[in-house]
């Protein structure tokens, strides 16, 4: 749908209604997400199981990548220490926009069993903005698959032409 406006001296400007284009692009983006794994402890083992033939994230369009520059989202799985938090932030900063984060397991979400340790970060969201939390200790591959489906819903609902605000930043504003 197109509309015409007269901006004054410059002539006519054509405005386009892009909601159908947004839907088409978001459907393509949600169906081909590349992920970066950041497995740190026992949740990392479940993360590997999710990529295996029984759970197979690839059937949902999620493809693992070794480089953060090729990844759309990062899965942080396991206990995040302050020393590893610097590396997680560095990898997150190297990812292209729009970028998303899934926090997998109790240790990533809030520190989990090791939260009283002096070197344990009390949640990934203290270091990088998180979009989807997957609970469990460790979460089953089915739970991570549900987290991926939730992330796909988030990607489908966003307008692709605007700069996105991660969930953690949006809550703080």
UniProtKB/Swiss-Prot annotation:
Binding site for [4Fe-4S] cluster: 42-43, 107, 137
Enzyme Commission number: 7.1.1.-
SUPFAM superfamilies: HydA/Nqo6-like
Cofactor note (record): Binds 1 [4Fe-4S] cluster.
Protein localization: Cell inner membrane
Protein keywords: 4Fe-4S, Cell inner membrane, Cell membrane, Iron, Iron-sulfur, Membrane, Metal-binding, NAD, Quinone, Translocase, Transport, Ubiquinone
GO term, biological process aspect, one: electron transport coupled proton transport
Disulfide bonds: none
PROSITE patterns per UniProt: COMPLEX1_20K (PS01150)
A molecular-function term among this protein's GO annotations: quinone binding
GO cellular component: plasma membrane; respiratory chain complex I
Family to which the UniProt record says this protein belongs: Belongs to the complex I 20 kDa subunit family.
Function: NDH-1 shuttles electrons from NADH, via FMN and iron-sulfur (Fe-S) centers, to quinones in the respiratory chain. Couples the redox reaction to proton translocation (for every two electrons transferred, four hydrogen ions are translocated across the cytoplasmic membrane), and thus conserves the redox energy in a proton gradient.
Oligomer and partners: NDH-1 is composed of 14 different subunits. Subunits NuoB, C, D, E, F, and G constitute the peripheral sector of the complex.
Protein name as it appears in the record: NADH-quinone oxidoreductase subunit B 2
């Amino acid at each position: 749908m197109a509309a015409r406006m007269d901006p004054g001296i410059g002539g006519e400007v054509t405005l386009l209604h892009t909601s159908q284009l947004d839907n088409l692009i978001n459907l393509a983006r949600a169906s081909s997400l590349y992920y970066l794994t950041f497995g740190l402890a026992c949740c990392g083992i479940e993360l590997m199981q999710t990529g295996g033939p029984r759970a197979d994230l690839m059937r949902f369009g999620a493809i693992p990548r070794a480089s953060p520059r090729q990844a759309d989202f990062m899965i942080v799985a396991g206990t995040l220490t302050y020393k590893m938090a610097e590396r997680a932030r560095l990898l997150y900063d190297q990812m292209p926009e729009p970028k998303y984060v899934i926090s997998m397991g109790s240790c990533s979400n809030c520190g989990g069993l090791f939260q009283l340790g002096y070197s344990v970060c009390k949640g990934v969201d203290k270091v990088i903005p998180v979009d989807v939390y997957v609970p469990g200790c460790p979460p089953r591959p089915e739970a991570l698959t549900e987290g991926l489906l939730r992330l796909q819903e988030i990607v489908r609902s966003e307008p692709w032409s605007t700069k996105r605000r991660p969930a953690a930043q949006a809550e703080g504003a």
